UniProtKB/Swiss-Prot annotation:
LDL-receptor class B repeats lie at residues 1182-1225, 1226-1268, 1269-1313, 1314-1355, 1357-1401. Residues 1-30 form the signal peptide. It is found in: Secreted, Extracellular space, Extracellular matrix, Basement membrane. Residues 108-274 form the NIDO domain. This is Nidogen-2. A motif (Cell attachment site) lies at residues 946-948. The keyword Cytoplasm does not apply. The lineage of its organism: Eukaryota, Metazoa, Chordata, Craniata, Vertebrata. Residues 323-403, 1021-1043 are annotated as: Disordered. It comes from Mus musculus. SMART domains: EGF (SM00181), EGF_CA (SM00179), G2F (SM00682), LY (SM00135), NIDO (SM00539), TY (SM00211).
Length: 1403
């Protein structure tokens, strides 16, 4: 056995076990402990120190290792079953949390492991020995027969956890648990790719999860996490891409019982590549245990089986967990339905290195789906290398029976035995790997420190019937290399007798350049003549269009018709067609509205109109495929129906036009011809039937005849018709032929129904379908409910057949539940989506879509949003034809449209402007001199007068006494007589009662205002123009983030033109706080004013004389003022209860005192299609309010019986989450994590106002203290989480708490204790503080995953995502007192308390 002698296993390995491990022959028996990769200190392993949270020093790698799309030169090994490319944070930051982690992680068994007191050991090393690399290569090639067929690793990194135990808080006198785990991770890489192997030997896993330290005594055990995480991308600050294999205890147990490459306990994954790799891709070559030699295994060997028992806590949505389905080549003798067994046989008459792993014919003991060479084609290793197995066989002779081998050091022995497995040949020569080895020993490859390794021969594969052998290029003409493979373009030489292929690599479409043409749920595969798309596991379709398996689907379309019904012509155009398909039992319902009555009645028997959807989405029997798996969402369906005996003939053409933005199929139907007349009182009855569909290239045909009956009372007539169907589509011609479906399939229609409702004007069809092989009449046999649709799975769940009539149900991707009841998952609210920066996630039923924000559009990959290049603006790029900048301004109207307007002081068309001579208009004082300047003018008082030129006074000084006056009083008294510069303003200072300067000074005649210091000096930058809000004489306001307006840009342009400081006689536009033109504009600092419109144009006839202001009307309508509604008298409630949000419903949970009355809990309101997150209650009008992130709305409903919901806000929302009601002021407040805003509005949705839109990253919870007028909210920004506060009108914003918090999800204010309390999903604590942030204390520090919290009486109640319930916590003791788990197990969001009265509290 391959163990370090210190491991305690002293039995030497046998030659048989060595060869078995080297050659890796798949079999269904579980992995034995001695079949792990060799490890131990004698193999060069390093030991990790004992402890609970240890990590290795950086292990420098010889060559960089690729992980996802990056390269790393060092690795770290941690105690807790994890490997990373960077040093680990403290274990409390990741060991008890679900994926994804914040750092890169490779986790074969992430749990709280403790090796203290010699409880196991952890070993790791980098290895380049040929034996280890060869074994890793064989695993990879087995699991990835296409993409990994030429994988030749050059380095491997091994980490082994041997007999390690879980962390335990052992009580005094109790012995530690004897449950110990052994598992191994191997990372094999070459220059281009990295593959990971996880190995779990039989009985190697004895514990399957650990209990979190912070809540160790709560009896909560977290299953081990197995998978990979890329880590947070620093440049994008988005959550990490990840792949998870486990989520429940059963899925952890499956690790050693199942496999994704056919060997129980061995799992393989493609985790890094220098080519595009959207996510980790698991191997998909699992076998079937029904033929396995292990009676203990009861589940299929498949990745899907390993992921059974999903729960919402760790549901891994398909966009985050894209599986690359590999299609292994199938030989002509493939075992039925893929069930196979691979055995190992040793040829005692041949070289001991020769091993037979051939593929046998069906029915033999060695039937295998993997195309290994036949026994006669296996390579014979050279004698010099074979002889090294035993020093006694110096000539390399075979070891005879009864001879005993003398084993030396295992490393030396395995290095000399190193070999690589031959790559599986492709039947269609799809991939041609470079030939660099042969049996003669030429071009042998040497592994470092391992000596030469036997080369692989090219194994000839017998051609299939009708197949043409490829003509390989001669030496020196090597085909181009792409993606680590040689890809050859093939061209037929028609008419050539030798029928050879030649190679043409020009213009070949490849995945690298065309991957965007595949569905987002598909992977792309290069073939010799091009590429094809294939849907991932758990999806079906043609690769270009993929839908989730088992999920319901919808079809929308239009129907037009030109019919003759009997002898009556009937026409109709573009009437609506809608179809609903229950995917997991093959039911298809079709409804066509607004068809004229005679035509609708006559079309009742024409079932193929809706029967198409039955064939498209039929329930598939094993080995069969429905229509959508073949055609995808683009095809043409032609039907010709001939009625008998009248020979009426009608033709139906249905054209599928792809999937719409909601992922629904769009179809256009046209009906033309003649149909028999059917009276209005007759109904049509169609018995179950079978149809045969024939498949060839890109055409499907079907021809059948059947009868139907028309009944009315006692009348029963039987008619018949003949149906010819033809379905054409575009198949991918590049895929190998062995991927084709059977030539003929049978569609069985168990139930058929047709009905026309004249009252509704709707024609309906319903069919229940299953498709499978052609059946031969025989005695009836039991059918698994999954195949005939009789199962009890939810309509959004997949049915997994088991043995006999047993089956299991699993919710399809995008839904959650136990399979018998599934609800939609909001990927947008939970963060499980791939929408990138500058995009918005929109939740759909069973899925989601990404929309670019305003000003952005999708790039070619349809995921990334890029900035839309703005249209040219002639006003900015200088292409306008306006007069020069100092004379006119350009006004942009969108696109390339603009207009020109002369500036004040100029007159003209805007394209040509001339100066206005203001002096000719006598605008100055009679004792002043006027000076005209381009675009303006100035006035100066004549000698002997003082003033600003518009007002001049005689230059005389009063003789009043000035003794005893303070500076403000002095300046105030003698303002008119102080020295004034030409054009200066006369301002009379304002003083307070003590004679000091009032901080806010305003010019009495012009309305200019500014701030002054204690000496009366103006504070720079505080002056405001007339008509605007006076400045707050304190700290300057925060800079605005909005774009500059025309007024602001014009003002800045003139200020720059004036050199930064305009004279008092120069005009500067006056703008309000929002950048709009103030209706009243004045010249310089004078009171010579006029009115302007919203674009700043002067309104003719509004200029005034000095001292008189024109009455200017604002161009923006004032806000509507509505009266506050009078509070109605509400009868007292019978008690207090809790309301909680749970996706599509609002739940009601009564309280008896502070105890939960769980038996009286019920659903208060069902809201189909909604995702209710935030919830609060208006105690004055007994109304409940909630936010809906699916509908992007805020709604309310009365608690009176029979009340209907009312939507009050329907626009301007992206992801409304937190909600708070102020019952005093009749207002509501909410957070929007999509827009990063906090808004307020009246309770009817009016008077909306954005309070904050800056310095917010992930705002969530919000609460209000209406008595004291304070607002509080949380922001769970991972880099800087915080709790903030402000007044209710948005003033005095400040950070209240930003230390020692992680993910503050829930927030509540207790009006009785005046405490602000929050529940933190990061620190797992419930804490409280006084409103000013002081007196902070911890109530409970062992929460699981809280989302929302509310306070009532002596308890807190919070919703919990780990328990999916409501948890109650005593305020005084901090103890958990009770919990309520709703019958429908899904995440609970917001929670609020409904009092029988309005709480008043005390100031």
């Amino acid at each position: 056995m391959f163990r370090d002698p210190t491991a305690g296993w002293l039995t030497p390995p046998s030659p048989l076990s060595l060869l078995v491990m080297l050659l890796l022959l798949s079999r269904v028996g579980a992995l034995r402990p001695d079949e792990l990769f060799p490890y131990g200190e004698s193999w060069g392993d390093q030991l990790l120190p004992e402890g609970d949270d240890e990590s290795s020093a950086a292990v420098k790698l010889a060559i960089p290792l690729r992980f996802y799309d990056a390269q790393f030169s060092s690795l770290y090994v941690g105690t807790n079953g994890i490997i990373s490319t960077q040093d680990f944070p403290r274990e409390t930051q990741y060991v008890d949390d679900d994926f994804p982690t914040d750092f890169p992680a490779i986790a074969p068994f992430l749990a709280d492991i403790d090796t203290s007191h010699s409880r196991g050991r952890i070993l790791y090393r980098e290895d380049t020995s040929g034996a280890v690399l060869s074994l890793a290569a064989r695993y990879v090639r087995t699991g990835f027969p296409l993409s990994g067929s030429s994988f030749t690793p050059t380095h491997a990194f091994l980490a082994t956890w041997e007999h390690v135990g879980a962390y335990e808080e052992v009580s005094r006198g109790a012995a530690p648990s004897g449950e110990l785990n052994t598992f191994q991770a191997v990372l094999a890489s070459d220059e281009s790719d990295t593959y990971a192997l996880f190995l779990y030997p039989a009985n190697g896993l004895q514990f399957f999860g650990t209990r979190p330290k912070e809540s160790y005594n709560v009896q909560l055990q977290l299953p081990a996490r197995v998978g990979f995480c890329r880590g947070e991308a620093d440049d994008l600050k988005r959550e990490a891409l990840y792949f998870s294999l486990t989520n429940t205890e059963q899925s952890v147990k499956n690790l050693y019982q199942l496999s994704n490459l056919g060997i129980p306990g061995v799992w393989a994954f493609h985790i890094g590549s220098r080519f595009a790799l959207d996510n980790v891709r698991p191997a998909t070559v699992g076998g079937d245990p029904s033929t396995a030699r292990s009676s203990a295994l009861e589940h299929p060997f498949s990745h899907a089986a390993a992921l059974e028992s999903y729960t919402e806590d760790s549901f891994h949505y398909y966009d985050e967990n894209e599986e690359d389905v590999e299609y292994p080549p199938v030989e002509p003798g493939e075992a039925p339905e893929g069930h196979s067994r691979i055995d190992v046989s040793f040829n005692s008459k041949a070289d001991p290195g020769l091993v037979d792993v051939g593929t046998s014919s069906p029915g033999s003991d060695r039937a295998s789906p993997w195309p290994y060479p036949a026994p006669g084609n296996w390579p014979s290793y050279r004698e010099t290398e074979s002889a090294s197995l035993d020093p006694q066989t110096k000539q390399g002779r075979p070891v005879g029976e009864g001879e005993v081998l003398d084993f030396r050091d295992p490393a030396e022995l395995l290095d000399q035995m190193g070999t690589r497995a031959p790559a599986p040949p492709e039947a269609d020569a799809a991939l041609l790997t470079p030939v660099n080895e042969d049996l003669g020993g030429r071009n042998t490859q040497s592994y470092p420190e391992a000596g030469p390794v036997p080369s692989e021969p090219d194994v000839p594969v017998p051609p299939l019937e009708g197949e043409v052998l490829p003509h390989y290029p001669e030496s020196g003409h090597v085909p181009p290399l792409r993606g680590g493979k040689y890809v050859i373009g093939l061209e037929d030489h028609v008419g050539s007798n030798d029928q050879v292929f030649t190679y043409n690599g020009a213009n070949l479409e490849t995945c690298e350049h065309s991957h965007g043409r595949c569905s987002q749920h598909a992977f792309c595969t290069d073939y010799t003549t091009g590429f094809c798309c294939h849907c991932q596991s758990r999806f079906y379709g043609n690769g270009k269009h993929c839908l989730p398996e088992g999920a319901p689907h919808r079809v929308n379309g239009k129907v037009s018709g030109r019919l003759r019904v009997g002898h009556i012509p009937v026409h109709f155009t573009d009437v609506d067609l809608h179809a609903y398909i229950v995917g997991n039992d093959g039911r298809a319902y079709t409804a066509i509205s607004h068809v004229p009555q005679p035509a609708a009645q006559a079309l009742l028997p024409v079932l193929p109109i809706g029967g198409l959807f039955g064939w498209l989405f039929a329930l598939e029997k094993p080995g069969s495929e429905n229509g959508f798996s073949l055609t995808g969402a683009t095809f043409v369906h032609d039907v010709e129906v001939t009625f008998h005996p009248g020979e009426e003939r009608v033709r139906i053409t249905q054209t599928a036009e792809g999937l719409d933005p909601e992922n629904y199929l769009s179809i256009k139907t046209n009906i033309e011809g003649q149909v028999p007349f059917i009276p209005a009182n007759f109904t049509a009855h169609i018995t179950p039937y079978k149809e045969f569909y024939h498949y060839r290239d890109s055409v499907v045909t079907s021809s059948s005849s059947r009868s139907f009956s028309l009944t009315s009372g006692s009348i029963n007539q039987t008619w018949s018709y003949h149906i010819d169907q033809n379905i054409t589509y575009q198949a991918c011609r590049h895929a190998p032929r062995h991927l084709a479906i059977p030539a003929t399939q049978q569609l069985t229609v168990d139930r058929a129904f047709a009905l026309y409702s004249e009252d509704e004007g709707v024609l309906r069809f319903a069919v229940t379908n299953q498709i499978g092989p052609v059946e031969v009449d025989s005695a009836p046999v039991g059918v698994n409910p999954c195949y005939d649709g009789s199962h009890t799975c939810d309509t959004t769940a997949r049915c997994h057949p088991g043995t006999g009539v047993d089956y299991t149900c699993e919710c399809t991707p995008g839904f959650q539940g136990d399979g018998r009841s599934c609800v939609d998952v909001n990927e947008c609210a939970t963060g499980f989506h791939r929408c990138g920066p500058n995009s918005v996630c929109v939740n759909l039923v069973g899925s989601y879509r990404c929309e670019c924000r305003s000003g952005y559009e999708f790039a070619d990959d349809q995921h990334t949003c890029i900035l839309i290049a703005p249209p040219p603006n002639p006003c900015l790029d200088g292409s306008h034809t306006c007069a020069p900048e100092g004379q006119a301004r350009c006004i942009h109207h969108g696109g390339s449209s603009f207009s020109c307007a002369c500036l004040p002081g100029f007159i003209g068309t805007g394209h040509q402007c001339s100066d206005v001579d203001e002096c000719a208009e006598n605008r100055c004082h009679e004792a002043a001199i006027c000076y005209n300047t381009p675009g303006s003018f100035s006035c100066r008082c004549q000698p002997g007068y003082r003033g600003d030129g518009f007002h001049c006074t005689s230059d005389t000084v009063p003789e009043d006494s000035i003794s005893g006056l303070k500076p403000c009083e002095y300046q105030q008294r003698y303002a008119q007589t102080q020295h004034a510069y030409p054009g200066s303003r006369i301002h009379i200072p304002q003083c307070d009662d003590q004679g000091n300067f009032v901080p806010l000074q305003c010019h009495g005649s012009t309305g200019f205002c500014w701030c002054v210091d204690r000496n009366g000096h103006e504070v720079p930058g505080t002056q405001t123009p007339p008509g605007s809000t006076p400045p707050h004489c304190g700290p300057p306001p925060e800079p605005t983030q909005r774009p500059r307006t025309v007024c602001e840009r014009w003002r800045e342009s003139l200020l720059e033109h004036y050199g930064g400081t305009p004279r008092d006689d120069q005009y500067v536009p006056q703008c309000d706080d929002l950048g709009h033109f103030i209706p009243l504009q004045c010249h310089g600092k004078s009171d010579f004013c006029w009115c302007v419109d919203k674009d700043g144009r002067e309104l003719q006839g509004t200029r005034s004389q000095p001292g008189t202001r024109p009455a200017c009307i604002p161009t923006v309508a004032p806000p509507v003022v509505r009266p506050t509604p009078r509070p109605d008298v509400t009868p007292p409630s019978v008690g207090t209860f809790l309301l909680y949000a749970q996706g599509q419903q609002i739940g009601h949970l009564p309280l008896n005192g502070s105890r939960l009355q769980k038996d009286a809990a019920r659903t208060l309101l069902s809201l189909h299609g909604s995702i209710v997150v935030g919830i609060d209650y208006d105690c004055r009008e007994r109304m409940v309010y909630w936010t809906d992130v699916a509908g992007r709305t805020i709604s309310r409903a009365s608690l009176e019986a029979g009340a209907e919901p009312e939507t009050i806000i329907t626009s301007g929302l992206i992801s409304p989450e937190g909600l708070a009601i102020d019952h005093f002021r009749r207002t509501m407040y909410w957070t929007d994590s999509g827009l990063d805003k906090i808004e307020r509005a009246e309770l009817d949705g009016s008077e909306r106002k954005v309070l904050f839109h800056t310095d917010l990253v992930n705002p969530r919870a919000i609460t209000v203290d209406p008595i004291r007028g304070n607002l509080y909210w949380t922001d769970w920004n991972r880099e800087a989480p915080k709790i903030e506060t402000s007044s209710l009108d948005g003033e005095n914003r400040r950070i209240l708490i930003n230390k020692d918090i992680g993910l503050p999800n829930g927030l509540t204010f207790d009006p009785f204790s005046k405490l602000l309390c929050w529940a933190d999903a990061g620190t797992k604590k419930l804490e409280c503080t006084l409103p000013d942030g002081t007196g902070r204390r911890v109530i409970q520090n062992h929460l699981n995953y809280p989302f929302s919290i509310v306070s009532y009486a002596d308890h807190f109640y919070h919703t919990d995502w780990r328990r999916d319930g409501v948890i109650s916590v005593n305020k005084d003791s901090g103890q958990f007192t009770d919990e309520f788990l709703p019958e429908q197990r899904s995440h609970l969001y917001g929670i609020t308390a409904v009092y029988p009265y309005c709480p008043t509290g005390r100031k």
